[in-house]
A protein has these predicted regions:
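Acidic, low-complexity central loop/insert segments
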Residues: 1-15
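Generic recognition of cysteine residues
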Residues: 10, 47-50
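Non-catalytic protein-protein interaction scaffold segments in large eukaryotic complex-forming proteins
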Residues: 20-22
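Glycine-rich, small/acidic residue-mixed loop/short-helix segments
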Residues: 24, 30-41, 49-51, 55-160
Length: 160
């Protein structure tokens, strides 16, 4: 992939396998299923390793992590792919693609714990010296509830 494609993919939130994903990534976390234009995983076809996990998350909703765009502090050296992302001294995710955008400056894709507020103060880099801000437009919708989750809530008396 050429650098311009990395830049475009990063800005659009299109993850690269093995760079923006890790061995624990499930399709829901990176928009490969259930998102606009998604088509990497089909729920009704075939048998594959991890299918039960994919079906459970699809029906109950709420994948454990989310792919977001981070705006990075440009006054220090740019962090690297794979660097930890920290909030309050605790690891909350990892960096994927890191690029220099013409208009936005340094940006990166990151897999972060789901539910992390958009205004959370984040740091990254080898020495945790690079400030990072979540692009709130890249956050997944908060009302993303699967059919199975609605059924569970109905049984518990929460949804009518």
């Amino acid at each position: 992939m050429k650098p311009i494609e990395w830049l475009t993919g990063c800005r659009l939130g299109a993850p690269r396998l093995g760079v923006d994903t890790d061995e624990r990534t499930i399709p829901h976390e990176v928009g490969w299923i259930g998102g606009p234009g998604a088509g990497a995983v089909h729920l009704n076809k075939g048998c594959y390793r991890g299918q039960e996990t994919v079906a459970r998350v699809h029906n109950l909703g709420r994948p454990p992590r989310m792919l977001v765009l981070l705006h990075l502090d440009e006054s220090v050296q740019r962090p690297s792919t794979g660097d930890a992302v920290l909030a309050g001294g605790r690891t909350v995710g990892r960096l994927g693609t890191v690029v220099e955008h013409v208009e936005l400056g340094p940006v990166a894709l990151a897999l972060l714990k789901r539910g992390l507020p958009g205004d959370t103060a984040l740091v990254t880099g080898p020495e945790a010296e690079v400030a990072a801000v979540i692009d709130v437009d890249s956050l997944p919708p908060a009302d993303d509830v699967g059919a199975g989750r609605r059924a569970v809530e109905r049984l518990r008396g929460g949804i009518r």
